[in-house]
């Protein structure tokens, strides 16, 4: 069925309350877009934080009376009577079928393949991760996920513990386990992400080696040999003290979700604790990695 999309631009401080207002006025879903860091907003592990210039996007049934919705929203104190908005008609497509048709097995590095659970694996002898993430979570098709998977493939993970900070579908944690890690920890704010990660881990036979935490329930004393966080440049900078504390001394850190022109500002947030490797780039995106400095 077709849909109507309503887009509002606001500050990070007001975005959550405006999202609630859209839901109260008929939206079937609300998403957030950080206008500067990434075209797709992913909530931070730990809490829902939004940054400076944020778009709030409501999705409505095509039969919705949008004039009535706008009239109701004009009564919201944070918006006022002449708030700036954009209404768009979305094409009627079978989005799930189109997504499934376009998701093919993909190779990352020398050993690793990410394969849709409904397709045959190209190389049975490779390290194959069978994935059925649903529409909401990562599949490996985005350059940032690809950069992270290639990095994991390049590491010797035998006997290691890996933390996937913002696990989504669980793709990175599961890949780490299939590549030899002994234990992986996935953290996410979204219960659906935790369930998707659990389902995918079970599908790949690694569930007993994966521990999953809703961010609010994450232990404060976690540490591991390898930490990977594929989120956004803004939260990577903001959460540097938290993320930087997770690797053990001598442990490895991988960060992505970063545009190439944002790399330097992210690096500056981590140079006090890490020796940073050369930046890896793909298209307009990049990955930052480094080794945690051992303290005396």
Swiss-Prot record:
Transmembrane segments: none annotated. Keywords: Cytoplasm, Methyltransferase, S-adenosyl-L-methionine, Transferase. Belongs to the methyltransferase superfamily. PrmA family. GO terms for biological process: methylation. GO terms for cellular component: cytosol. Its main location: cytoplasm. It catalyses: L-lysyl-[protein] + 3 S-adenosyl-L-methionine = N(6),N(6),N(6)-trimethyl-L-lysyl-[protein] + 3 S-adenosyl-L-homocysteine + 3 H(+). SUPFAM superfamilies: S-adenosyl-L-methionine-dependent methyltransferases. Methylates ribosomal protein L11. It is found in: Cytoplasm. It comes from Photorhabdus laumondii subsp. laumondii (strain DSM 15139 / CIP 105565 / TT01) (Photorhabdus luminescens subsp. laumondii). Its EC number is 2.1.1.-. One of its GO terms (molecular function) is protein-lysine N-methyltransferase activity. NCBIfam families: prmA. S-adenosyl-L-methionine binds at residues 145, 166, 188, 230. This is Ribosomal protein L11 methyltransferase.
């Amino acid at each position: 069925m077709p849909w109507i999309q309503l887009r509002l631009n606001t500050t990070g401080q007001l975005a959550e309350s405006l999202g609630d207002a859209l839901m109260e006025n008929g939206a079937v879903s609300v998403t957030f877009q950080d206008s500067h860091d990434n075209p797709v907003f992913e909530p931070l592990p730990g809490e829902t934080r939004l940054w400076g210039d944020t778009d709030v996007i409501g999705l409505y049934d095509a039969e919705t009376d949008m004039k009535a919705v706008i009239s109701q929203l004009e009564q919201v104190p944070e918006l006022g009577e002449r708030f700036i908005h954009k209404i768009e008609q979305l094409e009627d497509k079978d989005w799930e079928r189109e997504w499934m048709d376009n998701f093919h097995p993909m190779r990352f590095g020398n050993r690793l393949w990410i394969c849709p659970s409904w397709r045959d694996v190209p190389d049975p002898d490779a390290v194959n991760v069978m994935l059925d993430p649903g529409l909401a979570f990562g599949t490996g098709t985005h350059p940032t996920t690809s950069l992270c998977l290639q990095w994991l493939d390049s590491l010797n993970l035998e006997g290691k513990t890996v933390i996937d900070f913002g696990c989504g579908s669980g793709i990175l944690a599961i890949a780490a386990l299939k590549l030899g890690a002994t234990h992986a920890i996935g953290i996410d704010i979204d219960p659906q992400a935790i369930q998707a990660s659990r389902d995918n881990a079970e599908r790949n036979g690694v569930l007993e080696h994966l521990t999953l935490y809703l961010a609010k329930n994450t232990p404060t004393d976690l540490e591991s040999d390898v930490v990977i966080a594929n989120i956004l440049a803004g939260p990577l900078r903001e959460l540097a003290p938290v993320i930087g504390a997770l690797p053990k001394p001598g442990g490895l850190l991988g960060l992505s979700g970063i545009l190439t022109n944002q790399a330097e500002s992210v690096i500056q947030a981590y140079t006090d604790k890490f020796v940073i490797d050369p930046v890896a780039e793909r298209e307009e995106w990049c990955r930052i990695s480094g080794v945690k400095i051992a303290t005396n």
